[in-house]
Structures are given as structure tokens and as C-alpha cells.
């Protein structure tokens, strides 16, 4: 349930909802990447450094989830039911209705329930979600939206990490994909509450001001267990990775009772429009934002030693629950971020456009033991040349500013990552944007990048210490094609190739694929227009990680592989449709965590969904 996404060799840690960012720490699993997509109209992905948009963030990408709004002036909606592998059942209702006779005030509610087991032993997940929003036209030029979102996710027997990868002799283990280290008593529960508001004011025909505001609270409570060890092939006994540091570090895993809350208050006010200068039309956008994010987490930990588990060959989840000590404060910090930003698109000539922008960010974090404050100005410059009505080329530059949550051997947080992002590209647009293509070449330069020392922070519960490294470079090329090839044929195709190295020429994050190819297509049969068939292929190249162990340097490796998915949809009546999906058609066994433990991806699975629209 700890879903992480990557782009251009780095983790995506900027998640936005309606343009308002939330920065999250991957070590605390608050479900940021698991929000139910039924609540959103679409998901936008902007690749590369996005400091002009968000103020901070990895030079990977930013994900913006756009909420559904009440757009209909008459009652309409849809309901769906889905059933699938591992006892999956899912029900969703999406309803819109006018609240006034003229439709100027409208409401939309989306609600759903999902329950499913897993290919993993003992696992079960139950999810409830709801969103309600009211959109009101206060006049010809003014619109107000206000809403509330709720999600509850309860998971029983979730895994925390994976299965021990190596034996003490350096050989690799393999397991049944159902094997899990989660005990019967483990759980991970999350509750999300958000209120939000948007006010839009148009001025004449060319200018608009937008105010976005949100307050969110995410709470979680979990008791889980992890195993981090090597297996003695002779008897299945586990050996800890830090045993050479002395008896106190001879643990082979641990249990954790973690609870906490993250609160975010954020405002974003901006205006955008066009202006005339030197006889040409240009565009301008400017604004300011403020966010306050408080993270408070408490925990209770216990180390697990080899005799407590016994032979791992016999482990089946019946590990006794820890006699928990009272929870103590693990983290309490508040991050304030204030930004002012502006950007303009200047038409230098009919085919040539200059884009200039900057964002000033004041970032401050206050913890229990110290405070850190940084001021940073993120410049952006781009040049777009329209070759003809269909083709254009561009070049862009921006800087990188990324606060970090990794700590050094003294326990202090590392200074923010800084750097530069360069990009060249070629775009095409056909049939009024029904079909688009993009080819991009990028180069990312970073300093202060966290690199693991492989040793724990003294006095911590085994938390790994990191050091800051300068001179990290990622460079590569991306290609995308999206849209309608014909009236009946839709195609999405993307390919990426990059390399990422540190200042000594060593690979950075070699556990992430350097080459990927993704394709998804659908085709509506002309002879039977009620029937649509399609599928997709995701391919990635070989990945690896070298890990220094007490027994030498071991390499974890996953060869290149492709996953194939299929679907078919049949429009039974004007209002009712059925869709069947098959994921991992060829039942490929693959490892999603090419590090010290093994985490298998989902085996072949099926689902069928019925949708009724009215």
C-alpha cells in the first residue's frame, strides 16, 4: 500500500489537488498515492522540474489530480459495480443535479465502497470514499465552488517491506508469490478529511482571477512487522544485516506501532490573461501562495531477534503480537512555504514565443530541536518556435529546489537539493489536438543529493544515515504519442531512455529502469460499433542494486520484462455497458523492489464491471 512513482530517475514527491501541492514523506504511509480516482475528473502529469508551479520538488514530475465538478444543469449520473480476482467487490455512484430551477447552483456527489483480498496471504483491504461539491454561478463573471472529501482505508495484514532476498552464502531466494511476512494482527488504517473552495472571477473577456483554498487532515494508525535479514540455508535461521556492529544490532526485523496526523492549510491566488504590446498579443500570469503543513507522528518500536522467528522456512504469519510500550514522539515539525510567482508568454514574432517566469519561495521548517529557513528564487526561461500549423520546437531552463527528510550521522536533516533542469523538445498537433506527439531531450544537474551510508544513525531505531553528494546528473530522451489515429482507433504510446550518474560515474538509483516502453490502444469495431477491444503493454529493461553486506557485496537483479493487459467493452443498451479486464495476461512473475528484499508484483487477475448511465 506504499505506492511510489518515479520519473526521469527520481521519485515523484509533488502531489497536487486542483493545483495546490502537498509534500509527503515516503517513510510515513499516509496514502497520498492511493487516493481513489473515482473522485477526480482527470490526472495531469508535468514531467521535469516543476518549481515554477510548486516551489519545491524533485526534478521528476508533478502529479495534479483535478476534482470532479458539478457541470450539468440537469439531473444525470452513473452507477457501477465491479467484481474481480481475490474477492474484489467495488461499487461507485456519481450523481449530478441542479439545486435551482435555472441550474446556476449545482451539486455533485461521488461515493463508493471497495473490499478485496490479495494474492498475498492474509491480506484484506476495505475502502470507503465520498466527495460532495456545490458549484454556483454568482453572476455572469463569478463562480464559487465548495466541497468536502472523505476517505477511509483499513488494511489487515499489510506487508512492511518484503521477503528476505539473500542467503548468507550470497545466493538468491525465490518464493511463492502468496508468501507474506505480515502477521495476523498487523493493520494499517487511514482516514482523510478535506474541505476545499475555489472562487473564479472573470474581468471582461481576457482576464480571470482564481482563489483556491484547502484544509486537509490525514490520520493513520498502524501496527506492522518487517523482516530485514539473510537466510541460513542450512536451517532457515535469519541473520541480521547489522550484526557485525555488535549484539545490540543483531536484530533481523522489527515491529512498529505508528500513529500520526498531517494537517495542511493552503491558499493560492493568481490572475491570468492577455495584454497587447508593440502591436502583438501576449499572455501574463502572476500570483502568490501560502501553505502550512504540520506533521506529528508517535511510535513504539521493538526489535526482533533470530530466536523469536525461528526458521523462516516455517514462518506463516503466526508471530505473536508485541507487548507494546507506550508510544513516544517520533516527529513533530511544521513547514511554512510562502511564494510569489509570475510568468509571461511574449510573442516576439508570429512563429516565435518567449516564456519568462520566476518564483520566489520562502521555506521554513520548525522541529522540536532546531529550525531551518531557506529563500530561493526559481527562474524559468523557454523559447517556442512554431515551424508550421502542426509542428513546433522548444527549449527551456529552470532551477531545482528540493527540501529533504533524510538525516546525516549526527541526526540533522540534509540541506535542500539544488540544481538545474534543461530541456529541448519537438511537438506536433493534428486534427485540432485529436492527435499529439512530443519528443523531449532533458538534462538534470543536482547537488546535495542524499546517498545512503549503509550505517544506522547512532541512537536511532536503525534509521539509515545519509550524506549529501554533489554532481548528480540525469539525462535522457522521451517520446509520446496520444490521441485518435482514426475515428475508431485510439492510441497512447510512450518511450523513455535516460542515464543517471553521480560525480564519480556511479549509477544513481540503478533499481529504476533506464528504458521503458508503454502502449495502450483501443479499437471500436465498425461492423459492431457496440464492441470496443483494446489492451496495453508495459516494458522495462533490466534493473539492479548492489548492497554491501557482512558477507560481501550482493547484487539484486530483475531482468527486462513486459506486462500485457487486455480489455473489452460492450454497450449492451444506450445506458448500460459491460467491461472485462485481464491484467498481466501471461502471468509474468516479476520483482517490484529490487533491493534487499523481494516484493512480487500482481499475478494474472480478472475483473468485470457493469456501468449504468442516466
Feature locations, PLM:
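Membrane-embedded beta-barrel scaffold of Gram-negative outer-membrane proteins
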Residues: 200-202, 208-214, 218-224, 393, ...
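Acidic/polar loop-and-plug regions of large Gram-negative outer-membrane beta-barrel proteins
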Residues: 114-118, 131-202, 217-262, 307-333, ...
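Outer-membrane beta-barrel translocator/receptor signature
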Residues: 23-24, 39-41, 47, 52-132, ...
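C-terminal beta-signal and adjacent terminal beta-strands/loops
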Residues: 445, 539-548, 566-614
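Gram-negative outer-membrane beta-barrel transporters
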Residues: 349-351, 467-548, 586-589, 609-613
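Structural signature of Gram-negative outer-membrane beta-barrels, strongest in the C-terminal barrel
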Residues: 135-137, 262-264, 280-293, 329-446, ...
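Face-selective signature of the C-terminal outer-membrane beta-barrel domain
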Residues: 195-218, 251-368
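Periplasmic plug
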Residues: 4-49
Amino acid at each position: 500500500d506504499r505506492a511510489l512513482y518515479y520519473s526521469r530517475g527520481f521519485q515523484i514527491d509533488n502531489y497536487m489537488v486542483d493545483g495546490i501541492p502537498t509534500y509527503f514523506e515516503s517513510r510515513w504511509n499516509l496514502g497520498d498515492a492511493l487516493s481513489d480516482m473515482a473522485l477526480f475528473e482527470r490526472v495531469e502529469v508535468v514531467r521535469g522540474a516543476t518549481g515554477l508551479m510548486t516551489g519545491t520538488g524533485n526534478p521528476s514530475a508533478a502529479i495534479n489530480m483535478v476534482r470532479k465538478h458539478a457541470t450539468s444543469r440537469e439531473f444525470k449520473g452513473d452507477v457501477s459495480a465491479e467484481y474481480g480476482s481475490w474477492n474484489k467487490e467495488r461499487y461507485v455512484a456519481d450523481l449530478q443535479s441542479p439545486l435551482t430551477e435555472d441550474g446556476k447552483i449545482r451539486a455533485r456527489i461521488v461515493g463508493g465502497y471497495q473490499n478485496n483480498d490479495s494474492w498475498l496471504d492474509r491480506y484484506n483491504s476495505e475502502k470507503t470514499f465520498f466527495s460532495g461539491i456545490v458549484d454556483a454561478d454568482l453572476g455572469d463573471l463569478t463562480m464559487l465552488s465548495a466541497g468536502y472529501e472523505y476517505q477511509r482505508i483499513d488494511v489487515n495484514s499489510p506487508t512492511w517491506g518484503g521477503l528476505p532476498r539473500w542467503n548468507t552464502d550470497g545466493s538468491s531466494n525465490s518464493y511463492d508469490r502468496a508468501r507474506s511476512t505480515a502477521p495476523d494482527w498487523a493493520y494499517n488504517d487511514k482516514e482523510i478529511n478535506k474541505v476545499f473552495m475555489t472562487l473564479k472571477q472573470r474581468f471582461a473577456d481576457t482576464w480571470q482571477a482564481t482563489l483556491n483554498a484547502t484544509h486537509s487532515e490525514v490520520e493513520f494508525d498502524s501496527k506492522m512487522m518487517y523482516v530485514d535479514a539473510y537466510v541460513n540455508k542450512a536451517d532457515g535461521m535469519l541473520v541480521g544485516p547489522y550484526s557485525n556492529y555488535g549484539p545490540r544490532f543483531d536484530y533481523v526485523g522489527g515491529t512498529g506501532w505508528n500513529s500520526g496526523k498531517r494537517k495542511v492549510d493552503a491558499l493560492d491566488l493568481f490572475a491570468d490573461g492577455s495584454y497587447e504590446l508593440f502591436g502583438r498579443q501576449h499572455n501574463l500570469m502572476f500570483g502568490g501562495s501560502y501553505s502550512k503543513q504540520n506533521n506529528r507522528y508517535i511510535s513504539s518500536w521493538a526489535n526482533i531477534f533470530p530466536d523469536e522467528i525461528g526458521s523462516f522456512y516455517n514462518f506463516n504469519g503466526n508471530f505473536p503480537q508485541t507487548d507494546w510500550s507506550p508510544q513516544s514522539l517520533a516527529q513533530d515539525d511544521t513547514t511554512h512555504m510562502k511564494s510569489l510567482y509570475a510568468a509571461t508568454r511574449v510573442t516576439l514574432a508570429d512563429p516565435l514565443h518567449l516564456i519568462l517566469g520566476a518564483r520566489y519561495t520562502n521555506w521554513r521548517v520548525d522541529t522540536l530541536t532546531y529550525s531551518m529557513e531557506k529563500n530561493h528564487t526559481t527562474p524559468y526561461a523557454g523559447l517556442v518556435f512554431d515551424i508550421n500549423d502542426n509542428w513546433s520546437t522548444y527549449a527551456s531552463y529552470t532551477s531545482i529546489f528540493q527540501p529533504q527528510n533524510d538525516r546525516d550521522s549526527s541526526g540533522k536533516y540534509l540541506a535542500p537539493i539544488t540544481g538545474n533542469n534543461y530541456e529541448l523538445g519537438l511537438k506536433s498537433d493534428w486534427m485540432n489536438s485529436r492527435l499529439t506527439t512530443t519528443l523531449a531531450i532533458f538534462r538534470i544537474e543536482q547537488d546535495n543529493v542524499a546517498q545512503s551510508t549503509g550505517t544506522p544513525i547512532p541512537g536511532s531505531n536503525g534509521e539509515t544515515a545519509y550524506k549529501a553528494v554533489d554532481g548528480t546528473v540525469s539525462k535522457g530522451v522521451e517520446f509520446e504519442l496520444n490521441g485518435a489515429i482514426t475515428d475508431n482507433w485510439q492510441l497512447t504510446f510512450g518511450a523513455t531512455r535516460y542515464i543517471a550518474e553521480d560525480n564519480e560515474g556511479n549509477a544513481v538509483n540503478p533499481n529504476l529502469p533506464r528504458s521503458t516502453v508503454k502502449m495502450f490502444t483501443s479499437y471500436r469495431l465498425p461492423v459492431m460499433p457496440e464492441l470496443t477491444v483494446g489492451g496495453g503493454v508495459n516494458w522495462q529493461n533490466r534493473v539492479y542494486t548492489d548492497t554491501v553486506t557482512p558477507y560481501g557485496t550482493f547484487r539484486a537483479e530483475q531482468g527486462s520484462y513486459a506486462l500485457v493487459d487486455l480489455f473489452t467493452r460492450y454497450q449492451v443498451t444506450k445506458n448500460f455497458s459491460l467491461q472485462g479486464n485481464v491484467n498481466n495476461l501471461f502471468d509474468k512473475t516479476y520483482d517490484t523492489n529490487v533491493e534487499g528484499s523481494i516484493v512480487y508484483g500482481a499475478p494474472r487477475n480478472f475483473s468485470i464491471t457493469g456501468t449504468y448511465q442516466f
